[in-house]
Regions:
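Sec-dependent bacterial lipoprotein signal peptides
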Residues: 1-19
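Hydrophobic alpha-helical segments, principally membrane-spanning helices and signal/leader peptides
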Residues: 2-3, 7, 54-55, 61, ...
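Short, intrinsically disordered low-complexity segments
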Residues: 4, 25-27, 41, 77, ...
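Intrinsic disorder/low-complexity detector
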Residues: 6, 34, 50, 73, ...
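Compositionally biased amphipathic helical and low-complexity segments enriched in hydrophobic
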Residues: 7, 12-13, 30, 36, ...
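N-terminal export/targeting and maturation segments
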Residues: 19-66, 122-130
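Mature extracytoplasmic domains of secretory-pathway proteins
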Residues: 47-94
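C-terminal partner/receptor-binding element of secreted or periplasmic proteins
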Residues: 95-131
């Protein structure tokens, strides 16, 4: 096989692997939780050390809006599939527990009850830049 042909095969294989395996990158939010930037910055997922963004990460969807304190992470999620429930999830950082999807009203009530009513909310992209 000629050098040019071998080079073209290698180049094509490299391009295919690069497209299929967009490894993304992650930044620590708090505790063992990370914001994972995927698909060249078009999607953001919430993950921990043991979870990948495949399948929607920890919240079964993409992060739309996020806020955090030392004890809680508040996330508005967009489900990966249209039949799933849109809304908010709250992560208890210390207990490592995630709520079911809840309404914005319930999230605001828990935000206040948790003493986090003054924390700042960010779009996923803005949170990525802040982290």
């Amino acid at each position: 096989m000629g050098k040019n042909k071998l080079f073209v095969i290698f180049l094509l294989a490299f391009m295919i692997v690069g497209c299929v395996f967009d490894g993304g990158s992650k930044k620590k939010i708090v505790g063992n939780y990370y914001l994972w930037q995927w698909e060249g910055g078009r999607s953001y997922y919430l993950v921990d050390k043991h979870t990948s963004p495949n399948g929607g990460g920890l919240i079964d969807g993409t992060v739309q809006i996020i806020a955090w304190s030392d004890n809680y992470i508040y996330v508005q999620k967009k489900p990966l599939f249209s039949g799933e429930k849109k809304g908010w999830v709250i992560i208890d950082v210390k207990k490592q527990k995630i709520t079911e999807t809840i309404s914005e009203q319930v999230m605001k009530e828990r935000l206040s009850a948790n003493g986090d009513s003054k924390i700042q909310f960010y779009s996923a992209e803005s949170a990525w830049r802040k982290l």
